[in-house]
A protein has these predicted regions:
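Basic amphipathic alpha-helical segments that dock to polyanions
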Residues: 32-36
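Alpha-helical residues within the helix-turn-helix
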Residues: 20, 37-38
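N-terminal helix-turn-helix DNA-binding core of bacterial DNA-binding proteins
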Residues: 1-24
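Non-DNA-binding regulatory cores of transcription-related proteins
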Residues: 55-120
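Beta-hairpin "wing" of winged helix-turn-helix
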Residues: 41-55
Length: 120
């Protein structure tokens, strides 16, 4: 995303070029960009000179949205993940879980304030 943000004024860039510059495999990069595209953070341009570019200004994309697009959630702890709650018999009465939820909320709020443009 930083690579695209740096080129924002110059148009789209081919994934192969990003893969080469960032030393990332094409297959992995294709998976990342599928998630970013689905989330509306990047868009693909087809044809000669085509490739990917940011779907909106880097100043309007926050880091939280990028992480959610790539990871699906921000749950750092198993016991705070909705899917895992059913496996924890102590969830509702666990003091640690409530602290961890507060930590995750603080991290989420912070990441929502950081814009992609700030990383340039």
């Amino acid at each position: 995303m930083i690579n695209l943000a740096k080129r924002q004024e110059r148009g789209s860039v081919a994934l192969a070029q990003i893969a080469e510059e960032e030393k990332i495999s094409m297959k992995y990069l294709e998976r990342l960009f599928a998630g970013l595209k689905k989330a509306g953070l990047v868009k693909a341009e087809i044809g000669s000179g085509g490739g990917y570019k940011l779907a909106k200004s880097a100043s309007k994309i926050n880091i939280y949205d990028i992480i959610i697009a790539l990871e699906g959630s921000l749950n750092a702890f198993h016991c705070t993940d909705d899917k895992e709650k059913i496996y924890c018999s102590k969830f509702c009465n666990c003091e640690v879980t409530h602290v961890l939820l507060k930590v995750e909320q603080a991290v989420s709020q912070t990441l929502k304030k950081i814009k992609l443009s700030q990383l340039l």
